[in-house]
Amino acid sequence: MTDTLDLEMDGIITEQRLLERRRAAAEQQRMNQELQDMVNLHQCKRGIFCLVKQAKVTYDSNTTGHRLSYKLPTKRQKLVVMVGEKPITITQHSVETEGCIHSPCQGPEDLCTLIKTLCGLKDLIPFN
């Protein structure tokens, strides 16, 4: 496995940078897998209409806390209602929505809390 690095006279610093990059990449991959598992296991009364199931989510962790970013795709809905003998067509178009939820703590259950917060977000913020 080779990484593109500028070679330095002191191989120790280069080696330390390489090891740190590999460790960070492995940690990010582990967090992404954990997030995907949590999304797949999430169940609530909304089913497939839950924001957790509809949104594309990413999870970031740093020294100041955790952040769950979400992106909801553009949606188009069409409804035909009969009024007497005449059909009325209602078309609704919602734009792409994105945001993030920050948690300043560093507990082991933060990801679960962030997922539950995203699930309940539809009750707090009006989405189309």
Curated annotation (Swiss-Prot):
Q: What Pfam families does the database record attribute to this sequence? A: Adeno_E3_15_3
State any GO BP term from the record: symbiont-mediated suppression of host apoptosis
Q: Which UniProt keywords apply?
A: Early protein, Host-virus interaction, Inhibition of host caspases by virus, Modulation of host cell apoptosis by virus
Q: Where are the transmembrane segments?
A: none
- The answer to whether keyword Lyase applies is no
InterPro entries the UniProt entry points to: Adeno_E3-15 (IPR004985)
- What role does it play? Protects virus-infected cells from TNF-induced cytolysis.
Give the family this protein belongs to, as stated in its UniProt record: Belongs to the adenoviridae E3_15 family.
Q: Can you say what this protein is called?
A: Early E3 14.5 kDa protein
Per the UniProt record, the source organism is Human adenovirus C serotype 5
